[in-house]
């Protein structure tokens, strides 16, 4: 998998699929989710709450990825990835598992290009470097060879931090 790092607004980075951060209640309440709600209006929020209602649950388990329409955003769909628990805790392992679930779902949807913010680093406890550590080993997974992942960060400082973490994780993973 080719990993790109870009500074900007994740909602403006065109890709086949956006893997967006989500909370267990699938509420579009802040951060990237709040931006989705502002950009698209209530339709995606209604779709996510309908999903919960149809499943007979009020929240999804940690690690779940739920697909929705993308509205007027430059994606074929949005994958809402729950990489935090109900107390907004997370780990490198949980983020990696959640990203893998999202990438698998994206591939099954026919995606070749995927964009994502750094999951669990806003309201969650993870650092940008932790996210890099979680994602780096996936670059060498054969099942992801045909896709590219663009990780979108908000500053040049975050881009540098993420690049260094991914580079360091790749070196230590090869040992």
Region spans (language model):
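Phosphate/ribose-phosphate-bearing ligand recognition and processing surfaces
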Residues: 84-175
């Amino acid at each position: 998998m080719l990993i790109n790092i870009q500074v900007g607004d994740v909602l403006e980075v065109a890709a086949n699929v956006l893997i967006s951060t989500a909370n267990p209640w699938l509420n579009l309440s802040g951060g990237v989710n709040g931006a989705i709600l502002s950009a698209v209006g209530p339709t995606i929020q209604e779709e996510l709450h309908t999903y919960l209602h149809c499943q007979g649950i009020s929240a999804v388990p940690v690690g779940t990825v739920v697909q929705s329409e993308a509205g007027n955003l430059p994606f074929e769909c949005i994958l809402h990835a729950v990489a935090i628990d109900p107390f907004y805790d997370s780990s490198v392992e949980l983020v990696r598992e959640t990203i893998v679930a999202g990438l698998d779902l994206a591939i099954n949807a026919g995606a070749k290009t995927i964009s994502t913010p750094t999951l669990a680093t806003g309201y969650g406890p993870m650092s940008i470097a932790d996210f890099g550590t979680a994602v780096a080993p996936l670059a060498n997974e054969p099942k992801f060879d045909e896709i590219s992942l663009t990780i979108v960060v908000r500053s040049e400082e975050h881009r540098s931090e993420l690049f260094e973490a991914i580079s360091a994780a790749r070196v230590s993973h090869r040992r």
